[in-house]
Amino acid sequence: MDNLIKSLETFKNQMKNENLEIIISDSNICGEGEHKMMKIISNNYDKNSNKKICIYGLDADLIMLSLINQLSNNIILLRDNTFNTKLNESKRIYTYLNICKLKTYICKDLRFGNNNLSEISDLNLIYDYIFLCFLMGNDFLEHIPSLLIKEGGINVILKCYNFVIDKYKSPLINLNSLNNNDWKSCINLDMLKDIFYNLSKSESYFFTNIYSAYKSNKSIYKDIYDLNSINTTENSNIYFYTEDKIKYNETGYKSRYYQYYNVININSACESYLIGLYWILGYYNNHCHNNWSWYYEYHEVPFASDLYSYLCKNKNKFLENINYCESLQSSSCISSLEQLFLVLPKESLLEKYFLKQGNSKLITKLFTFFGFFSGGGIWQ
């Protein structure tokens, strides 16, 4: 990384006479690239300007962060979909996404046939939409087990949202509370509870019919079988599990699910998941809690029915404690070296160097075996 940073600085110096402003935010500056990029855009561009901001990339994080950026009307994302790197520029195929138009279509779709949304701002609708997408899974939390993108999960969650909004006639996310770090009232937990309830009504049908249908399709595991056949040596530290130990299409799948993923206390898992939703919401909102230490300690997330049951019994107690939750308090950033140790291969030279030190605390951050269970769903 040091060599890369030096090379980037050299490139920046070489471009001094090209009338370009080059901003480098390297690994020594805390934060993910997309978030740092959005902060730079917000701090360096006039929101009243008509100048277009072009960003290379089309991943979900980048799209969602662009939707809630104060300059969203000016942002255009693009990506080169040409896999042949030898093609000249004129023959390349690019995909463009106009964030302003996307925002308009999302709001139009949410408002269609629902007069109860007329008092809710477009920005608030976008925040609601993004929060609902958290339930589909992201870099920090897995998806709700009965929600899969390839099985129309987004449409399912939006139907639940429209049903609930008819009842409450107010947004799911309170932007004033969110911007003031008032966690207790930034999410309408009664609405979220009802969304979980509506999701839970079709849970058993989903696993018995929809989920088990494609799980029986052996072709979706072809690449995994090929990888496992390669990793047969005694020293191999990666293995992909394909057998469906949980048997979702049989009675008792919930108990087997929690047992398989070593979830002993379901209430604790539900609480951790909900705290995770608050953390991610704050993270997307300019990282307003400035917390760098939170992580979800379980491999998978609870069922919608269990999240509903948890909120029915524990909502008030949860809200009493959320403003004082350690995971939503400011903390120190993890160093670049610590981050590297979280992902380094066991036999790396850097790891060997620290092993010689004997008492290095960083050694505890190394992984030794990696097992991937593909039974939770196909690549989405």
Model-derived segments and spans:
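Noncatalytic, typically N-terminal accessory segments of nucleic acid-processing enzymes
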Residues: 1-380
